[in-house]
UniProtKB/Swiss-Prot annotation:
Its main location: cytoplasm. Pathway: tRNA modification; tRNA-queuosine biosynthesis. Catalyzes the NADPH-dependent reduction of 7-cyano-7-deazaguanine (preQ0) to 7-aminomethyl-7-deazaguanine (preQ1). It catalyses: 7-aminomethyl-7-carbaguanine + 2 NADP(+) = 7-cyano-7-deazaguanine + 2 NADPH + 3 H(+). The active site is at C189 (thioimide intermediate), D196 (proton donor). It holds the Pfam family QueF. It comes from Yersinia pestis. The gene is queF. This is NADPH-dependent 7-cyano-7-deazaguanine reductase. NADPH binds at S90, K91, R257, G258. Its EC number is 1.7.1.13. GO terms for biological process: queuosine biosynthetic process; tRNA modification. One of its GO terms (cellular component) is cytosol. The lineage of its organism: Bacteria, Pseudomonadati, Pseudomonadota, Gammaproteobacteria, Enterobacterales. Belongs to the GTP cyclohydrolase I family. QueF type 2 subfamily. Homodimer.
Amino acid sequence: MSSYQNHKALAELTLGKPTAYCDYYDATLLQAVPRSMNREPLGLYPDNLPFHGADIWTLYELSWLNSNGLPQVAVGEISLNADSINLIESKSFKLYLNSFNQTIFADKESVRMTLQRDLAACAQGNVSVALYDLDEITGQPISNFNGECLDKQDIRIDSYEFNADYLQGAAGKDHVEESLVSHLLKSNCLITHQPDWGSVQIHYRGPQIDHEALLRYLVSFRHHNEFHEQCVERIFNDIMRFCQPETLTVYARYTRRGGLDINPWRSNTDFVPLTGRLARQ
């Protein structure tokens, strides 16, 4: 159980509660979760964040009406800066997007500007929004994380409770730069405890991290209850704390739920994330 699971900000969320679906635009449906909620227990504060990054959302179920009442569809990509005050709760995001369904907008740019304005106001931070017609993205290849996959190791695991101590002593003497990938990341929603499935790429330069220890650590998230963004920041923080790499990037891409996927990344070096969807997305 996360130390902040009873935080008052969580009690106000619609997540985990019966809700009505609204067909007409309503920005008040968006709900924020303070990033400080999970950062402060990790010793992370706005004036000394050890990383930069973003939460990249893909919107697969976005529709509105044009001026003639004809439904329009697009795929959206949102990038929310990690230094925003709040993250955006995903169920509220879904409800907000549903409120576009029967709302007339003059054109696609009006939809984009509305999304950017509302999301920035909710997150209290910088947001970029891109909307794509379907013919712009049809036929795009499935992407893959570059790096050595950790998942084929012949090891026995019998504990699935989160334990950062797997990384204790995991940093070796050899100095390397490598990318490591696992598709076994699984955590659970902080509120509903529904499973969240993801793939994670860890790129670092520094003392070589023991691959078995790192895989055991990642598998230990299996019963852990935390939002996607919080899990990625926890992974970044734990690797920095125990292994002390010179540079580190953690990038996770989660499978979609409710027409949305969330893909957070955190880094202390130059990094440009590839945003193509993975096989399970």
